[in-house]
């Protein structure tokens, strides 16, 4: 097992809901990403999801699209993201890091080179939003050769052979998209999420993480009650957008928001234990 698999397994054994915050690398500026990563770990993150900025992030709503634009305006590249992970690893060799991005930058380097450089930097998993599992073999083979976990999205409409393909190809965890549409919009239907998560669990022993639509501690707790991991992105990135003129405040503000979610999730574990 690699670092991500070990962490997810440890959380499950401890009855701890894994908390996975997302930030876009290079936002609000490249110099702020590594300190922000450490701040999120200090606030209770179990895994970090680091977005690779891309010019056409089709699965993302306006909040993360704007974050990508800010990062790209600073000239943030894929290899800059690798360097950020490398610098994070100088102080933290334990917290798993998952890269989330789109296929074009990966194809530009080629699956083998991408996987080698990602692993060398200290990356543990890769979620390529627009990579269908049926076409993923060259990528998953390169990832396997470098002990990287391929992570795939399961949408509310995913069923049958597609769901089976995702569960067969994934490592680390399966990422269930809680809402139809892009990130940061719509309301959560926790009863429906519970049914969909059960359908995924019927096909795999992997933990199921749920993301898209989690806005605060209350919604994190509601989702955490039915999932193994809670993934939060737009709610954090939106706070960054409000602090672009005061970027030095970003780590503390995001740590406070994430800490509230951590406490809400830990409250679930205490309820189960009692």
From Swiss-Prot:
Organism: Alkalilimnicola ehrlichii (strain ATCC BAA-1101 / DSM 17681 / MLHE-1)
Purpose: The alpha subunit is responsible for the aldol cleavage of indoleglycerol phosphate to indole and glyceraldehyde 3-phosphate.
Family: Belongs to the TrpA family.
Catalysed reactions, semicolon-separated: (1S,2R)-1-C-(indol-3-yl)glycerol 3-phosphate + L-serine = D-glyceraldehyde 3-phosphate + L-tryptophan + H2O
This protein's name: Tryptophan synthase alpha chain
Pathway(s) served: Amino-acid biosynthesis; L-tryptophan biosynthesis; L-tryptophan from chorismate: step 5/5
EC number, as in UniProt: 4.2.1.20
Keyword Cell inner membrane attributed: no
Gene that encodes it: trpA
Matches recorded under Pfam families: Trp_syntA
Quaternary context: Tetramer of two alpha and two beta chains.
PANTHER family assigned: TRYPTOPHAN SYNTHASE ALPHA CHAIN, CHLOROPLASTIC (PTHR43406:SF1), TRYPTOPHAN SYNTHASE, ALPHA CHAIN (PTHR43406)
Keywords for this protein: Amino-acid biosynthesis, Aromatic amino acid biosynthesis, Lyase, Tryptophan biosynthesis
Keyword Lyase: yes
A single cellular component GO annotation: cytosol
Signal peptide: none
Cross-referenced HAMAP family: Trp_synth_alpha (MF_00131)
């Amino acid at each position: 097992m690699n670092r991500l698999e070990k962490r997810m397994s440890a959380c499950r054994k401890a009855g701890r809901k894994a908390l996975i915050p997302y930030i876009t690398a290079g936002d609000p500026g490249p110099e702020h990403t590594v300190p922000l990563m450490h701040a999120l770990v200090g606030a209770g993150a179990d895994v970090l999801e680091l977005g690779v900025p891309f010019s056409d992030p089709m699965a993302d709503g306006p909040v993360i699209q704007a974050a990508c634009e800010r990062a790209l305006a600073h000239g943030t590249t894929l290899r800059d993201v690798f360097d950020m992970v490398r610098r994070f690893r100088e102080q933290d060799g334990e917290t798993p890091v998952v890269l989330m991005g789109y296929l074009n930058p990966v194809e530009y380097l080629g699956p083998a080179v991408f996987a080698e450089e990602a692993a060398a930097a200290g990356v543990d998993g890769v979620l390529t939003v627009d990579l269908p599992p049926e076409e993923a073999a060259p990528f998953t083979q390169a990832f396997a050769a470098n002990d990287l976990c391929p992570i795939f999205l399961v949408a509310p409409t995913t069923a049958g052979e597609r769901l089976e393909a995702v569960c067969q190809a994934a490592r680390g965890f399966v990422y269930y998209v809680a809402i139809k549409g892009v990130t940061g919009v719509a309301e959560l239907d926790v009863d429906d999420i519970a049914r969909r998560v059960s359908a995924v669990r019927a096909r795999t022993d992997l933990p199921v993480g749920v993301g898209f639509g989690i806005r605060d501690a209350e919604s994190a707790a509601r989702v955490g009650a039915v999932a193994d991991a809670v993934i939060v992105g737009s709610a954090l990135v939106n706070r960054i957008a409000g602090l672009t003129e005061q970027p030095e405040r970003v780590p503390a503000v995001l740590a406070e928001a994430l800490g509230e979610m951590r406490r809400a999730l830990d409250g679930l574990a205490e309820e189960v234990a009692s």
